[in-house]
């Protein structure tokens, strides 16, 4: 420290007077000494001392965090060990009981009768068989036909790789250029004019669950079930047919029920389109009614043409002041098949909304296949299953194989009997996006292709944004709230896309052109498989 001597405290300085004013003169011994080197050294020591204190504090925090993690691991280990110990004790007690009990000699097996020996036992109860196109062989499926078929295309990667068309190529290129994208989906095949199996699984799973309810309770039924109930109720009301009492009866003769509904929908003049009219708080927040209510706003369904048709037929009559109120056919069917927990759709409008959207998917599917003609061979066909599957693909010997001209709705009838019914029988809760992922993709692409006759090339990646967001949330961020928001946004886009297709002057031509330009479809056979698979793979020589 520096010494500051203040001599003026001990001895008064002489005063100098000039013109009657007193001035104090400094004492020559009042001197402040400052050493530059000492000041720098002190500053350096202070900085080192501060750094040392920060390091000590950081080490203490790290030690506390490590102690916390170790304590948590120890508690988890103790918990798991106790569970294992308990299970071992249970097994030990069971073994002791078996050892104490008398051993019974096995009796010789009884000879089987000829009829019993000729009937093979099927142990795979979770396996079912579907057929997509007339004349094609059936496919044995465990849970997801499109995923299992796509997985079988990557067995000869040294010779050829599957390619899925312009839409999937653009999606793959943009995905590989994104800064934030799951590392496990960045396969080497994505850079070889193909799409990796993991990325295809992620995309197809996202598309297939676009209309799935990610939260529900006992009052909900799937959108597919809602659509089937409404279509059957409309058919029973119009034809006086008996009300179905089993789920299988909902699927019986679906082509006739849907065909009559499409015919009446074409001739119906009510409704302004195929869009809902939500209020501001209903627009983008959630599919569910606002404020935890069971109904939407008063004019929510007023502009939708399907709702207008159902209301005009008397199926959705909710007038409580009627002298002789009509029987609620929809509620009768849901109560009979799905139980008494399902409320009437007029009061619980979630099921009504998702059912109407699912009917739109069925209508587009029916329109695309209404006049389809499936030929045995076609020079311009994209999908060649015999090339993709090799010797496993053998043509069927059904009677439809040699048929030249198919009647109106006959191809959809075949698809219903051989694909829709087996799939829904195996799992009654699948959404329509799972049944028809191709229609979901057409709906999404219709928003990016507002006018297919204009020579515009869409170079933006915004059309894949919602799909990428869901994939990122599932694989990387894993935030439930953000995942729910992304799924809701994708579901709204599907709704808007379906409306965009059905309001077109020619929905069939509009949708078929999207399949041709974006996915490579050329004929009705390609369209049929695209509706079911959501893609049209071809064999591409490996680079």
Swiss-Prot record:
GO BP: symbiont entry into host cell; viral genome packaging; viral penetration into host nucleus
Interaction with major capsid protein/MCP: region residues: 1-54
Entry's Gene Ontology cellular component terms: host cell; host cell nucleus; viral capsid
Region annotation (Disordered) ranges: 101-120
Signal sequence bounds: none
Subcellular location: Virion; Host nucleus
Database matches in InterPro entries: Herpes_UL25
Sorted UniProt keywords: Capsid protein, Host nucleus, Host-virus interaction, Viral genome packaging, Viral penetration into host nucleus, Viral release from host cell, Virion, Virus entry into host cell
Protein family according to the UniProt entry: Belongs to the herpesviridae CVC2 protein family.
Subunit structure: Heterodimerizes with CVC1. Interacts with major capsid protein/MCP and triplex capsid protein 1/TRX1 at the pentamer vertices. Interacts with the large tegument protein/LTP.
Function: Capsid vertex-specific component that plays a role during viral DNA encapsidation, assuring correct genome cleavage and presumably stabilizing capsids that contain full-length viral genomes. Participates in the interaction between the capsid and the tegument through interaction with the large tegument protein/LTP.
Alphabetized HAMAP family for the sequence: HSV_CVC2
Protein name from the UniProt record: Capsid vertex component 2
Organism field: Saimiriine herpesvirus 2 (strain 11) (SaHV-2)
Organism classification: Viruses, Duplodnaviria, Heunggongvirae, Peploviricota, Herviviricetes
């Amino acid at each position: 420290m520096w010494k500051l001597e203040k001599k003026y405290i001990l001895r008064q300085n002489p005063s100098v007077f000039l013109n009657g004013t007193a001035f104090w003169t400094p004492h020559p011994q009042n001197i402040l000494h400052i050493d530059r080197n000492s000041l720098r050294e002190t500053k350096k020591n202070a900085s080192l001392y501060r750094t040392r204190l920060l390091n000590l504090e950081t080490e203490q925090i790290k030690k506390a965090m490590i102690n916390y993690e170790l304590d948590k691991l120890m508690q988890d280990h103790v918990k798991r060990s106790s569970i294992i110990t308990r299970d071992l004790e249970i097994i030990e007690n069971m073994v002791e009981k078996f050892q104490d009990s008398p051993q019974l000699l096995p009796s010789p097996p009884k000879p089987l009768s000829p009829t019993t020996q000729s009937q093979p036992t099927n142990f795979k109860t979770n396996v079912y068989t579907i057929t997509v196109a007339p004349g094609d062989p059936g496919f044995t499926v465990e849970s997801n036909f499109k995923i299992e078929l796509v997985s079988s295309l990557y067995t000869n990667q040294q010779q050829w790789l599957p390619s899925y068309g312009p839409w999937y190529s653009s999606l793959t290129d943009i995905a590989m250029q994104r800064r934030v994208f799951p590392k496990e989906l960045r396969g080497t095949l994505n850079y070889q004019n193909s799409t990796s199996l993991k990325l295809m699984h992620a995309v197809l799973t996202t598309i297939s669950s676009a209309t799935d309810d990610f939260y529900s309770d006992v009052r909900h039924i799937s959108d597919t079930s809602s659509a089937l109930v409404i279509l059957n109720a409309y058919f029973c009301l119009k034809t006086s047919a008996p009300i179905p009492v089993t789920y299988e009866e909902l699927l019986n003769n679906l082509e006739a029920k849907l065909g009559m509904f499409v015919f009446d929908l074409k001739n119906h003049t009510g409704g302004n389109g195929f869009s809902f009219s939500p209020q501001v708080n209903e627009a983008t927040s959630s599919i569910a009614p606002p404020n935890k209510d069971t109904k939407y706003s008063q004019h929510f369904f007023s502009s939708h043409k399907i709702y207008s048709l159902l209301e005009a037929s008397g199926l959705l009559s909710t007038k409580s002041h009627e002298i002789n109120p009509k029987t609620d056919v929809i509620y009768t069917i849901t109560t009979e098949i799905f139980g008494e927990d399902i409320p009437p759709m007029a009061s619980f409008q979630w099921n009504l909304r998702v059912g109407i959207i699912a009917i739109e998917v069925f209508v587009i599917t029916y329109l695309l296949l209404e006049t389809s003609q499936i030929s045995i061979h076609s020079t311009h066909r994209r999908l060649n299953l015999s090339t993709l599957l090799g010797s496993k693909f053998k043509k069927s010997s059904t009677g439809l194989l040699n048929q030249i001209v198919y009647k109106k709705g006959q191809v959809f009838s075949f698809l219903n009997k051989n694909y829709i019914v087996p799939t829904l029988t195996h799992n009654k809760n699948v959404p329509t996006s799972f049944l028809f992922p191709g229609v979901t993709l057409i709906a999404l692409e219709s928003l990016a292709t507002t006018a297919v006759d204009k020579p515009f090339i869409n170079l933006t990646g915004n059309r894949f944004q919602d799909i990428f967001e869901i994939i990122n949330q599932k694989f990387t961020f894993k935030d439930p709230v953000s995942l729910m928001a992304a799924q809701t946004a994708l579901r709204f886009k599907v709704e808007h896309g379906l409306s965009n297709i059905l309001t077109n002057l020619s929905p069939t031509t509009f949708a078929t052109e999207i399949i041709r330009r974006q996915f490579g479809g050329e004929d009705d056979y390609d369209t049929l498989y695209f509706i079911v698979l959501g893609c049209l793979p071809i064999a591409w020589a490996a680079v």
